[in-house]
Amino acid sequence: MDAGKAERRAGNGRRTDGRRHLVVAAACAAFIAAMVGVTYASVPLYAMFCALTGFGGATRVGAAPTSAPIEREITIRFDANVAPGLPWAFAPVERDVTVKVGATSLAHYTAANRSSMETHANATYNVSPPQAGAYFVKLQCFCFDEQTLAPNEKLEMPVVFYVDPAIAQDPDLKTLTDITLSYTFFPAKTPDKAAARASGTGG
């Protein structure tokens, strides 16, 4: 009888430990999901998240290249997206360009406000494949600042960039021939004073 009771107690203990582990795992998963959700809800936090983790192929912001271009060429493809709630048309002028690695290059996007109101937006960005983000360096980009378009205004926005020659030393990217640079514009919060002026209630 004593042996049977001991076995039952041991079995109950194992079940309790198993439930405890499941609860801890579920709590961790919920915390991670909540953090990712909060991050995506805020464009500035999203950019910080990408910069810290490399998630989605976050690119580098840097100075002009210090070494000469190399002979290797890579085709850069451009992608454009607009989040729901932003009445903009947004597209790349050039669908793709082939550049020498290490050479400073220029591309353009256009954005048009299709509404009758002034609108403000911020752009997030990423590179595919994600590993290439560490070597894609932007010198000038509309994504660095909030963009404002007047009613029905259309704007051409440049991107100045280069691919760091150090990519040639990365064994995982030695056969890479294409990189996709993707942007998504999200609505930005209008400052209170600007909103008040637009509604006619401001001083």
Curated annotation (Swiss-Prot):
GO terms for cellular component: plasma membrane. GO terms for molecular function: copper ion binding. It is a single-pass type II membrane protein. The keyword Transport does not apply. Residues 43-203 are periplasmic. Its main location: membrane. GO terms for biological process: respiratory chain complex IV assembly. Disulfide bonds: none annotated. Keywords: Cell inner membrane, Cell membrane, Copper, Membrane, Signal-anchor, Transmembrane, Transmembrane helix. It is found in: Cell inner membrane. Residues 1-19 are cytoplasmic. The chain crosses the membrane at residues 20-42. Belongs to the COX11/CtaG family. Exerts its effect at some terminal stage of cytochrome c oxidase synthesis, probably by being involved in the insertion of the copper B into subunit I. This is Cytochrome c oxidase assembly protein CtaG. The lineage of its organism: Bacteria, Pseudomonadati, Pseudomonadota, Alphaproteobacteria, Hyphomicrobiales. The gene is ctaG.
